[in-house]
Curated annotation (Swiss-Prot):
Annotated protein name in UniProt: DNA mismatch repair protein MutL
Keywords, sorted A to Z: DNA damage, DNA repair
Gene3D superfamilies (UniProt xref): 3.30.230.10, Histidine kinase-like ATPase, C-terminal domain, MutL, C-terminal domain, dimerisation subdomain, MutL, C-terminal domain, regulatory subdomain
Biological process, per Gene Ontology: mismatch repair
Function: This protein is involved in the repair of mismatches in DNA. It is required for dam-dependent methyl-directed DNA mismatch repair. May act as a 'molecular matchmaker', a protein that promotes the formation of a stable complex between two or more DNA-binding proteins in an ATP-dependent manner without itself being part of a final effector complex.
Protein family membership: Belongs to the DNA mismatch repair MutL/HexB family.
SUPFAM superfamilies: ATPase domain of HSP90 chaperone/DNA topoisomerase II/histidine kinase, DNA mismatch repair protein MutL, Ribosomal protein S5 domain 2-like
Pfam family name, one: HATPase_c_3
Record-level Gene Ontology MF annotations: ATP binding; ATP hydrolysis activity; ATP-dependent DNA damage sensor activity; mismatched DNA binding
InterPro entries with a match to the protein in the record: DNA_mismatch_repair_MutL (IPR020667), DNA_mismatch_S5_2-like (IPR013507), HATPase_C_sf (IPR036890), MutL/Mlh/PMS (IPR002099), MutL/Mlh/Pms-like (IPR038973), MutL_C (IPR014790), MutL_C_dimsub (IPR042120), MutL_C_regsub (IPR042121)
One GO cellular component term noted in the UniProt record for this chain: mismatch repair complex
Superkingdom: Bacteria
Length: 619
């Protein structure tokens, strides 16, 4: 008797399921990809029990007649390949013909579809890879696939599934990845009736889709990137270094619209950002890499999440060029978005300090003297304290002046160092004599010895609030009596989950946040100074800033969250110009605050122009 036997189709499909179907998220990915390949304009995903109990994926694509509906359950039956050469020109999401029979072999599977203009549809039901039950069904547009009781007949696999909320998180991420790859397709996902993800088709502004995935506050921080070279094109959006996460979950790379988790690509992105981010922060990018299908092999990973490039170095060089160009240009500095700089206490990138100083000086001086800053050709040479840009100097805008060259050589406490080591004399701010405002934004004062002092009140407010919140946290005492807020907000599932898991940290900071069902949270109280803040923007920013659940709650782990609080408190307080009394109160706060030359976004707080420099210009 022969010892080698041919495996049954049922067993073959279950073995294939071990590679293709890892968890509910794998099923979601495969079925949604089929919907996209069918030309769907809208895809809906409904989940129960984290996707273990039920997954329903419906689309409005081409649909299938009876013969195709039955054939798609046969292993290696596919509409994407006809001959060997097709394998090297793949432009569809699926192509192997393994996914549906593998899924049907480990679940209770139902397919309902109809060909276009058909008067009757088809329903095919399969239980655990058994024989299909084929019957007529009402006609419909597109296809609905239902997967129930995943791994019900493979208990060894089912016991390795995680808790429902963990599986749900992976399933939602599968939807998000495909939604980011196809902004022209509408995506709607729900779990037991509660919305997980909702985004209508937005082909004209993919940033709307990114904002739906990462939170509405991401939109103004996203900037286009593009690099086209022979054989490769890199397009997409990258966030300013101020909008970051504490993990790599904001890194999305797609190759020919297929989500790829490639170490080489991720490393290239991180290296491009490394001089712009504070320690422990990760960039946010959504990048599409388009190459000739013949120059990339997508058939090297069961879930197709890894690829092999014919010219990996060329792809990485194009990616580096696209990101470096955007980061050097620093478009956020002129976009109304507070710019990029490390957190307080972190070394500031010299190039970005130069950008921030140049922007501030230009606005202040043009308002005061009606003329542009001198160029590097007619400015005096930098003083001994001027920053040396060194290897980062190429990031500075051409013609940008070192701080000392712009304000003269006389020593002034805010002039030369990207990070100051010495604070001004005690009582310095309280002794300033307010003179008025410039451009509806900057406050102008007379300082000691007739020095002209120009202050950005928003940056100053943020610096003062940051000191207050940090000192309250360092004291170990409960925060001051919080203010009743009383609002409910539906947030992205990741943000809602982070806030609920971080309730202890939020309580330390003076917030009371409670789950309110689904992805809705109730914000009951906020710390003093945040009473009028935009609740949605504040909570989404806090969700990104909170430390992991395992972190010790101290001033180090909570520093980013405190920075977010200070920023939003300053936005609220500075929404309208400060009155004379409010500005004098701010000067008193600055005398009591820990001095730093910039706010946490890199905006310069205060500038001095010595009397000698004014006299020189008046000649």
């Amino acid at each position: 008797m022969s010892r080698i036997a041919r495996l049954s189709d049922v067993l073959i499909n279950k073995i294939a399921a071990g590679e293709v179907v890892e968890r509910p998220a794998s099923v979601v990915k495969e079925l949604v990809e089929n919907a996209i390949d069918a030309g769907a304009g809208t895809v809906r995903v409904e989940l129960d029990g984290g996707g273990v109990d039920r997954i329903i994926v419906s689309d409005d694509g081409h649909g299938m007649g009876r013969s195709d509906a039955v054939a798609c359950l046969e292993r290696h039956a596919t509409s994407k390949l006809r001959e060997l050469d097709d394998l090297f020109h793949i432009d569809s999401m699926g192509f192997r013909g393994e996914a549906i029979p593998a899924i049907a072999s480990v679940s209770r599977f139902t397919l309902h579809s109809a060909a276009a203009n058909s008067e009757v549809g088809t329903r095919v039901s399969v239980e655990g890879g058994g024989p299909p039950l084929v019957e007529d069904a009402p006609p419909r547009t597109g296809t609905v696939m239902t997967v129930e009781d995943l791994f019900f007949n493979v208990p060894a696999r089912r016991k390795f599934l995680r808790r429902g909320d963990t599986e749900l998180k992976h399933a939602e991420e599968a939807v998000v990845r495909l939604a980011l790859a196809y902004p022209e397709v509408g995506f709607f996902a729900s779990h037991e009736g509660g919305t997980l993800f909702s985004s209508a088709a937005c082909p004209d502004d993919p940033r709307e889709r990114i904002a739906a995935a990462l939170g509405s506050t991401s939109h103004p921080h996203l900037f286009p990137v593009e690099e086209r070279r022979l054989g490769v094109a890199v397009t997409g959006f990258a966030a300013s270094p101020e909008f970051t996460f504490n993990n790599a979950r904001g890194l999305y790379t797609f190759v020919n619209r297929r989500y790829i988790r490639d170490r080489g690509l991720i490393g290239t992105i991180q290296r491009a950002y490394q001089d712009f981010l504070a320690a422990g922060r990760q960039p946010v990018v959504v990048l599409h890499i388009d190459v000739d299908p013949r120059a990339v092999d997508v058939n090297v990973h069961p879930q197709k999440q890894e690829v092999r490039f014919a010219d990996a170095r060329g792809v990485q060089e194009a990616l580096t060029a696209a990101l470096s160009r955007m980061l050097r240009a620093a478009p956020w500095l002129g976009s109304g978005v507070e710019g990029a700089a490390p957190q307080a206490g972190q070394p500031m990138d010299a190039a970005h300090y130069a950008h921030a100083v140049e922007r501030f000086l230009t606005r202040a001086q043009e308002a005061a003297w009606g003329g542009p800053l001198p160029t590097a050709m007619d400015a005096p040479g930098p003083g001994p304290g001027a920053p040396s840009l060194g290897p980062l100097g190429q990031g500075a805008r051409p013609g940008a002046l070192p701080f000392a060259a712009a304000v003269g050589q006389a020593p002034a406490f805010g002039q030369a160092q990207p990070q100051l080591n010495e604070a001004p004399p005690p009582g310095y701010f309280g002794a300033l004599r307010p003179l008025g405002m410039l451009g509806g934004r900057f406050h102008v004062c007379e300082g000691p010895g007739g020095t002209l002092v120009v202050m950005d009140p928003h940056a100053a407010l943020e610096r003062a609030r940051l000191t207050g919140y940090l000192r309250a946290l360092e004291s170990g005492k409960p925060p001051p009596a919080p203010t009743l807020f009383g609002t409910t907000l539906e947030l992205p599932v990741a943000a809602a989950k982070a806030l609920v898991e971080g309730r202890e940290a939020l309580s330390r900071l003076g917030f009371d946040v409670e789950p309110f069902g689904g992805t809705t949270v109730a914000l009951k109280t906020v710390p003093p100074g945040l009473e009028g803040a935009d609740a949605r923007s504040l909570l989404e920013a806090l969700a990104r800033a909170l430390p992991p659940k395992s972190a010790t709650l101290d001033t180090v782990s909570l520093a980013e969250a405190v920075r977010v609080m200070a920023c939003h408190a300053a936005k609220q307080a500075g929404a309208v110009p400060l009155s004379d009394a409010q500005f004098r109160a701010l000067l008193g706060e600055l005398d009591r605050a820990d001095f730093h030359p910039t706010c946490s976004h890199g905006t310069v707080v205060v500038l001095e122009m010595p009397l000698l420099e004014l006299e020189r210009r008046a000649r």
